Amino acid sequence: VKIKLWGTRGSIPAPGPETIRYGGNTSCVGVTLSDGSMLALDAGTGIRCLGLAQPDEPARLHILLTHLHLDHIQGLVFFAPAFRPQTEIVIWGPASPEASLRDRIARYISAPLSPVEVRELPCDVSFRHCPESEWEIGSARIRAASVSHRGPTLGYRIDDGDSSLAYIPDHEPALGADLDQLEEDWISGFALARDASLLIHDGQYTDAEYPNHVGWGHSATSHALSFARRTGADRTVLFHHDPMHSDDELDALGREARDRWIGFGGDPARIELGAERAEYELPARAPSALV
């Protein structure tokens, strides 16, 4: 299973000389499953570069949206495969009593916000609400569950063979509670991240910033690390960086996170901050024990 980060920023794109190392594009993660199936997790501005990296040939792509805030869908109309008639795109997302997924996305992909409307996309595009039960895409088993954030919001777990990826980019698990005191069943997103090979998790705020943003739907560094420790994730990537944080500030946040992880008795190499174009590879099968 190959994973590549195409957009790691939260809220709004933050291009410029101070965000070169970690990137300024908003949320998008590319996942290539062991059978070659291609997934995109969210469609922020990072999906534009993901699309440009795809070969111009018939393909079936799945886009899994966590929610419909602009920073997670604003790249859809700049996704090159959507303008190829030979491409089939399946867009998954949260259900809402308000309107269908297609109709909610069409509010953005329509005038006056977009020069292109959903019905004008030349690709074969379909929209599906994520089921409450596990389902399959290619070689993977996919699970979606509601998590603590503003509006209908999902986190995802992707299991392919013996490897698992948990993707929870917008998440406030500590809202009104101490994570270390909660039982597992009361921790938002716990089942998605339990013993994950790789956890990509919201880490937007420093601990000093969080008190002014309680209820906004995002995590402080300490909350993200407590969540990772409680769930037993093997490796954690902090994601959805605040647009106000420069590369140097994120470097400092990363050092603080690793020091805190050492305090938990953990290996600091298992904690890192997500950077655009970073790649990870998870084995679909665990190595066999030596005989």
How would you describe each model-predicted region?
Residues 1-169, 174-179, 189-190, 247-291:
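Binuclear metal-dependent hydrolase catalytic cores
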Residues 172-269:
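Cap/insert and terminal regions of metallo-dependent hydrolase folds
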